[in-house]
Amino acid sequence: MSRSLKKGPYINVKLEKKVLAMNESGKKVVVKTWARASMISPDFVGHTVAVHNGNKFIPVYVTENMVGHKLGEFAPTRTFRGHAGNKKK
């Protein structure tokens, strides 16, 4: 189920403040965040956000196509090792 339109999108307040401050100053600094559930707003476009995947921070460069998605979608938490198969001799 998606979030109610009445509530609006969830954007982490601290993350939004940091991005807006960078937009005003014109600096491009990588911002670390643990807020994987935070939605990407149009203000984030052009910035790099380091999203925590449970082990380390994955740098995510935000483009226009990512607006409306959540930050956690672009930082996978699991590594796929491959299915079991026949060992080649």
UniProtKB/Swiss-Prot annotation:
InterPro entries linked to this entry: Ribosomal_uS19, Ribosomal_uS19_bac-type, Ribosomal_uS19_CS, Ribosomal_uS19_SF
Keywords tagged on the record: Ribonucleoprotein, Ribosomal protein, RNA-binding, rRNA-binding
Parts of the chain that traverse the membrane: none
Top-level taxon in the UniProt lineage: Bacteria
Recorded GO MF terms: rRNA binding; structural constituent of ribosome
Keyword Phosphoprotein assigned: no
A GO biological process held by the record: translation
One GO term describing the cellular component: cytoplasm
Disulfide linkage: none
Protein family (similarity comment): Belongs to the universal ribosomal protein uS19 family.
Functional summary from the UniProt entry: Protein S19 forms a complex with S13 that binds strongly to the 16S ribosomal RNA.
PANTHER family to which the protein is assigned, alphabetical: RIBOSOMAL PROTEIN S19P FAMILY MEMBER, SMALL RIBOSOMAL SUBUNIT PROTEIN US19M
Protein's UniProt name: Small ribosomal subunit protein uS19
Organism listed in the record: Phocaeicola vulgatus (strain ATCC 8482 / DSM 1447 / JCM 5826 / CCUG 4940 / NBRC 14291 / NCTC 11154) (Bacteroides vulgatus)
Gene name as annotated: rpsS
